[in-house]
Amino acid sequence: MACFRVILYLSVIFFVQCVFAAPKGITKVAPENHNFFGRITSYAHPKDVPDPVPMYQQFAALAQQSNCHNYHINISVGDATLLYSWGDNDRNQRLQLFHSKSLGIVASWAGMNPTKINSILGAADVFLVDVDRRYFPHAEKGAKLYKGFQDAYKRVAPTFIKELQYYQELYNEDRVSLTGLSYGAALANIALLHVKKNLKRGSIYRTVAFGLPRVGNQEWANSIDKHADGKFFYVANGNDLVVRAPPRELGYQHPSGQIWINPSNSSKWKFYPGQENVHGANSEFGYSIPDHTGVYFRTEIASLWGHCPATVGKD
């Protein structure tokens, strides 16, 4: 049954994307937003990334580090120190908290563990369900989330918020940042609204998610845009399959904030304003798993097979 669910999920993604895939070379500029089955599509021109590259490199290293099985508290990753770790990276995705000189208290979630069945099943539980208003009371009316990701976040949420508040006080730190790869990127996306509601001090400095799958519907994407205050970014590397899944045709929608590295693993990256920008990753039809666990801002994020401890800007 478990294998059937995974196979069915991948088959649906492939079929729908083949039928509806966007052509290459889209040049339309206006209007800025266009309806796609009632959902927003941006035609805004790409821009330079809005922050210094070293910031994204530090985020990438911390996104990689939470995937490492062998680690110890107080390990250094760039300008950050590991403070806390939770989860078995099977039923519960590993969460790690760092104190970074440049980013504040950083929460990083590991990506899907392909060697553990519960981690795979959580990622395959693809149905859209209503947001749990106990955690997300400020989400837009009608907001829905990917069931497996919402369930995974709810398991960690009480511990996460408690430890986050503790380390903010311990380090007298007002900045909070969120990151992760793949499944972990989805949890960083979901955490944004919950963290913002529960902060006792400070604010969310940045959220940078790598290899982010679509996590919710149009109303959830709108909620991220509204509450992120322009500080949410997700990075697509080349023809990464995961960033293109689940398909929009199933009701899913990315929020604003895409940074696309194209070609994959290169030093060519641009920021694509608005939701589902046609000039960004949606303009290419392709499915690459190697691009998913690749090099982001000259920093490898390769899950279990990457640098452990993670390195910053050395790839």
Swiss-Prot record:
Its EC number is 3.1.1.-. It comes from the Eukaryota. GO terms for cellular component: extracellular region. It catalyses: a monoacylglycerol + H2O = glycerol + a fatty acid + H(+); a diacylglycerol + H2O = a monoacylglycerol + a fatty acid + H(+). Belongs to the AB hydrolase superfamily. Lipase family. Class 3 subfamily. The active site is at residues 182, 240, 292. GO terms for biological process: lipid catabolic process. Disulfide bonds join 68-308. Secreted lipase involved in Dandruff and seborrheic dermatitis (D/SD) probably via lipase-mediated breakdown of sebaceous lipids and release of irritating free fatty acids. Shows activity against monoglyceride and diglyceride substrates and generates free oleic acid from the substrates mono- and diolein. Able to cleave the oleic acid from both the 1 and the 2 position of the glycerol backbone as 1,2 isomers of diolein were converted into oleic acid and glycerol. Keywords: Disulfide bond, Glycoprotein, Hydrolase, Lipid degradation, Lipid metabolism, Metal-binding, Secreted, Signal. It is found in: Secreted. The keyword Transmembrane does not apply. Glycans are attached at residues 74, 265. This is Secreted mono- and diacylglycerol lipase LIP2. InterPro entries: AB_hydrolase_fold, Fungal_lipase-type, Sec_MonoDiacylglyc_Lipase. The keyword Hydrolase applies. Residues 1-21 form the signal peptide. Gene3D superfamilies: alpha/beta hydrolase. PANTHER family: ALPHA/BETA-HYDROLASES SUPERFAMILY PROTEIN, FUNGAL LIPASE-LIKE DOMAIN-CONTAINING PROTEIN. GO terms for molecular function: hydrolase activity; metal ion binding.
